[in-house]
From Swiss-Prot:
It comes from Rattus norvegicus (Rat). Residues 72-74 are annotated as: Interaction with phosphoinositide-3 kinase. This is Sodium/potassium-transporting ATPase subunit alpha-3. GO terms for biological process: adult locomotory behavior; blood circulation; brain-derived neurotrophic factor receptor signaling pathway; calcium-mediated signaling; carboxylic acid transport; cardiac muscle contraction; cellular response to amyloid-beta; cellular response to retinoic acid. Mg(2+) binds at D707, D711. The chain crosses the membrane at residues 78-98, 122-142, 279-298, 311-328, 763-782, 793-813, 834-856, 909-928, 942-960, 976-996. Residues 99-121, 299-310, 783-792, 857-908, 961-975 are extracellular.
Length: 1013
């Protein structure tokens, strides 16, 4: 990313520089070595194409360029992560509360002889809450990153280099520019190489380009684009078969792969939606607290309190507004969901990403391995002049065809014999489809198909011994082998051949029909052409098969076949049939795509594969739904040129990467706006990033799936990047926020559902927690305004927030989803907030007020039973709290000492506390749902039922446990005092059920606009 040190002076400059770097990286790969001759390349890098570099020269270059490795992405130091948990977001609010408490205690200690320790305790408790929850969240995230660490394979990689004419193994990190390197099948390419010689070399570029077919490598320049040409192999791709020798033209971060990794680590990562929500919520709560505090500060000054008293009141009100237990609740909710998702194969790297998935409105998915099974499978055969369907299901429950036909027997023989793939050893008791194969994708597909339908291929090969073979090469486009036949009476050799269908057909004079050879006439050629086009149009890779029995008189037993200078016939053969292969969709994907559609999520396919294949899979999994046409489909139907079709008539579209290169941002925006179903084919990594940015410009929250290194910039840029756990590369796993352990697209949909559920349940938890703020604040306000004895003390407020309310609030995280969760549109992050005005108005203005009434009712009942009628309480505060007054008269003329008065007051605190617990029962039950009736939802949440019992038991314990009067100033209550709040609790339940009934009967009406949070 350039040297950052000298940019410290002006942050603006470095921002501009980063943007420029990113724009450079977004441009396609610039490279010229593939157009130079071998001699020019050797001259440019001062090397010899036979001897290689000298040892001293190699050391010199290594010192100059540094090791051949990718710079690891900058990691956040652990202490910074810990501090973020301690001082980030919600914790700040509690820290401010704690500091204010210490301040208030300081003021009291300085001005009073015998200050009450309440504020000191409160401050200590608040600080403890933050530290404990901070440690908890830090531990959770550290656990996820431990799993991440274990993904990194620590095996140092070796490379075979030629220096001073000798072959030597060196650590891949020591390879330098100009080195002569040899690679063979099974090796990882150690750097970007310009090939100077190759023998049957094929490389798997899928982690770079997304192209799943192995690509041939040769010394010739075949394309202007370095990613497409055959004479360059790239760092960290795999060599599948053959051998090659090349000159290193780039190492480390300067390789194509290195540029992509740099591109990923240089991207700005925005805040997660839930972080923005929590910030918004803190601003709201702080606003309410400060507004109330300041109003009553002014009011108490008007009422004649001293400055110091007014400041203490101000602090008291602000602290009473802080929901102490909420930080822990949010953390626990996110953790629970992350655990639940891990059970469903989604590993979440950072807790906040859990919710991001729920607000996703667009998923850009990779095709290979995510939507498909990532194993080529035979899908169709054409023999006896008809197309037969093969079984592509994962459990072989699909269709079958007539296996007794003689033509099929011949076809299966060719496919099994003219095939170099073999099963790896020791897998006899593993199902055929799950076995590992040594060989390329198409050959393994044929091997598995024949093994399943015709029995052991190994036996077939033993019975028909191979005597000669011409491997596949790109000039003749066929593969041929010659075998002895298994019939002991037949001494002829059997020649079998497979390859590109049109090339195979050109070499044939006859065709096998119902086991008999017929002449290959024009009619049959047309039938072949139609079948070939039909299978090709399904996006399948088609191969042709033919055979020929070599006449015994020309080729007697023991004939020496020469495969270099061919001494046998390769024309006038007998055409047997076609077989076509596809990487079939995963079983659960179509259903998952359907769920996304009903949840209002747009699924876009982005792949490096061919447009026809991409479109076929998109139709197969429902990304392009039935009846929706692309521009090409409409043109074909109406028989007019594509240019005459109005693109707006087509709901679906397939866009080729080469066209995307020339698009402006406006054109990309237009495509994203006008088409509901989009497939991008033949895209490069840089284009993937452009697509993600385009979606984000539309205001979408974008999830991106990918497994290759090529996907990492897009994974990083997206709101949530989803990497593949099995097939994914290390770079993609580092860039992602979430990892699918089973590589299955369907797991993403589970993730979306969990994400929406956590958002709903957090809303419910917050609504539940905030409601009890009103019965906690109002006693304080009346205490100031009406000058009555304090109805509820600070310690009791803490017992509610950190005691009785905790388990019920967390239990809402276990609440099952409401029926409409996957039928809603994705939430709009600008308007649909976690905590909105309606939630505040419900919690504070409606339910909270009923709760406060219940508490005051208990308070007045107890004081009246003790002789202080409500009318006499107003204005009694100064005398009540004065230690020197020991003869205060009640409404009946009895005299009360200071100690006696305080016992009654603390009994009132306890009763007020118990009343809040009783009304919170109803609040918890109504918070289970936002729209459904509680009777619809049922009481299946066992944790919630436990929560109800737990808070009641805790309240009873605090009231009746001996010694509580000293420790927490809680006193035992008469049983009848528990029932004071029951009617209010019932009222809350009825009130809310009626509100939800109106919501359901009259969607979009006034009640919904005002009260649906």
């Amino acid at each position: 990313m350039g040297d950052k040190k000298d940019d410290k002076s002006s942050p603006k400059k470095s921002k501009a520089k980063e943007r420029r770097d990113l724009d450079d990286l977004k441009k396609e790969v610039a490279m010229t070595e593939h157009k130079m001759s071998v001699e020019e390349v050797c001259r440019k890098y001062n090397t010899d194409c036979v001897q290689g570099l000298t040892h001293s020269k190699a050391q010199e270059i290594l010192a100059r360029d540094g090791p051949n490795a990718l710079t690891p992405p900058p990691t956040t130091p652990e202490w910074v992560k810990f501090c973020r948990q301690l001082f980030g977001g919600f914790s700040i609010l509690l820290w401010i509360g704690a500091i204010l408490c210490f301040l208030a205690y300081g003021i009291q200690a300085g001005t009073e002889d015998d200050p009450s320790g309440d504020n000191l305790y409160l401050g200590i408790v608040l600080a403890a809450v933050v530290i404990i929850t901070g440690c908890f969240s830090y531990y959770q995230e550290a656990k996820s990153s431990k799993i991440m660490e274990s993904f990194k394979n620590m095996v140092p990689q070796q490379a075979l280099v030629i220096r001073e004419g000798e072959k030597m193994q060196v650590n891949a990190e020591e390879v330098v520019v100009g080195d002569l390197v040899e690679i063979k099948g099974g090796d990882r390419v150690p750097a970007d190489l310009r090939i100077i010689s190759a023998h049957g070399c094929k490389v798997d570029n899928s982690s770079l380009t997304g192209e799943s077919e192995p690509q041939t490598r040769s010394p010739d320049c075949t394309h202007d684009n370095p990613l497409e040409t055959r004479n360059i192999t790239f760092f960290s791709t795999n060599c599948v078969e053959g051998t090659a020798r090349g000159v290193v033209v780039a190492t480390g971060d300067r390789t194509v792969m290195g540029r992509i990794a740099t591109l990923a680590s240089g991207l700005e990562v925005g805040k997660t939606p839930i972080a923005i929500e929590i910030e918004h919520f803190i601003q709201l709560i702080t606003g309410v607290a400060v507004f109330l505090g300041v109003s009553f500060f002014i009011l108490s000054l008007i009422l004649g309190y001293t400055w110091l008293e007014a400041v203490i009141f101000l602090i008291g009100i602000i602290v009473a507004n802080v929901p102490e237990g909420l930080l822990a609740t949010v953390t626990v909710c996110l953790t629970l969901t992350a655990k639940r998702m891990a059970r469903k194969n989604c590993l979440v790297k950072n807790l906040e990403a859990v919710e991001t998935l729920g607000s996703t409105s667009t998923i850009c998915s990779d095709k290979t391995g995510t939507l498909t099974q990532n194993r080529m499978t035979v899908a169709h055969m054409w023999f006896d002049n008809q197309i037969h369907e093969a079984d592509t299901t994962e459990d072989q429950s699909g269709t079958s065809f007539d296996k007794s036909s003689h033509t099929w027997v011949a076809l299966s023989h060719i496919a099994g014999l003219c095939n170099r793939a073999v099963f790896k050893g020791g897998q006899d008791n593993i199902p055929v489809l799950k076995r590992d194969v040594a060989g390329d994708a198409s050959e393994s597909a044929l091997l598995k198909c024949i093994e399943l339908s015709s029995g052991s291929v190994k036996l077939m090969r033993e019975r028909n011994k191979k005597v000669a073979e011409i491997p596949f090469n790109s000039t003749n486009k066929y593969q041929l082998s010659i075998h002895e036949t298994e019939d002991p009476n037949d001494n002829r050799y059997l020649l079998v051949m497979k390859g590109a269908p049109e090339r195979i057909l050109d070499r044939c004079a006859t065709i096998l029909l119902q086991g008999k050879e017929q002449p290959l006439d024009e009619e049959m050629k047309e039938a072949f052409q139609n079948a070939y086009l039909e299978l090709g149009g399904l996006g399948e890779r088609v191969l042709g098969f033919c055979h020929y029995y070599l006449p015994e008189e020309q080729f007697p037993k023991g004939f020496a076949f020469d495969c270099d200078d061919v001494n046998f016939t390769t024309d006038n053969l007998c055409f047997v049939g076609l077989m076509s292969m596809i990487d079939p969709p995963r079983a659960a994907v179509p259903d998952a795509v359907g769920k996304c559609r009903s949840a209002g999520i747009k699924v876009i396919m982005v792949t490096g594969d061919h447009p026809i294949t991409a479109k076929a899979i998109a139709k197969g999994v429902g990304i392009i739904s039935e009846g929706n046409e692309t521009v090409e489909d409409i043109a074909a139907r109406l028989n007019i040129p594509v240019s005459q079709v109005n693109p707006r008539d087509a709901k679906a579209c397939v866009i080729h990467g080469t066209d995307l290169k020339d698009f402006t941002s406006e054109q990309i925006d237009e495509i994203l706006q006008n088409h509901t179903e989009i497939v991008f084919a033949r895209t490069s990594p840089q284009q993937k990033l452009i697509i993600v940015e385009g979606c984000q410009r539309q205001g979408a929250i974008v999830a991106v799936t990918g497994d290759g290194v090529n996907d990492s910039p897009a994974l990083k840029k997206a709101d949530i990047g989803v990497a593949m756990g099995i097939a994914g590369s290390d770079v993609s796993k580092q860039a992602a926020d979430m990892i699918l352990l089973d590589d299955n697209f369907a797991s993403i949909v589970t993730g979306v559902e969990e994400g929406r559920l956590i958002f709903d349940n957090l809303k419910k938890s917050i609504a539940y927690t905030l409601t009890s703020n009103i019965p906690e604040i109002t006693p304080f306000l009346l205490f100031i305004m009406a000058n009555i004895p304090l109805p509820l003390g600070t310690i009791t407020i803490l017992c509610i927030d950190l005691g009785t309310d905790m388990v019920p609030a967390i239990s809402l995280a276990y609440e099952a989803a409401e029926s409409d969760i996957m039928k809603r549109q994705p939430r709009n992050p600008r308007t649909d907030k976690l905590v909105n005005e309606r939630l505040i108005s419900m919690a504070y203005g409606q339910i909270g007020m009923i709760q406060a009434l219940g508490g005051f009712f208990s308070y007045f009942v107890i004081l009246a039973e003790n002789g202080f009628l409500p009318g006499n309480l107003v204005g009694i505060r100064l005398n009540w709290d004065d230690r020197t007054v020991n003869d205060l008269e009640d409404s009946y003329g009895q005299q009360w000492t200071y100690e006696q008065r305080k016992v009654v007051e603390f009994t009132c605190h306890t009763a007020f506390f118990v009343s809040i617990v009783v009304v919170q029962w109803a609040d918890l039950i109504i918070c289970k749902t936002r729209r459904n009736s509680v009777f619809q939802q049922g009481m299946k949440n066992k944790i919630l039922i436990f929560g109800l019992f737990e808070e009641t038991a805790l309240a009873a314990f605090l009231s009746y446990c001996p010694g509580m009067d000293v420790a927490l100033r809680m006193y035992p209550l008469k049983p009848s005092w528990w029932f004071c709040a029951f009617p209010y609790s019932f009222l809350i339940f009825v009130y809310d059920e009626i509100r939800k009934l109106i919501l359901r009967r009259n969607p979009g009406g006034w009640v919904e606009k005002e009260t649906y949070y």
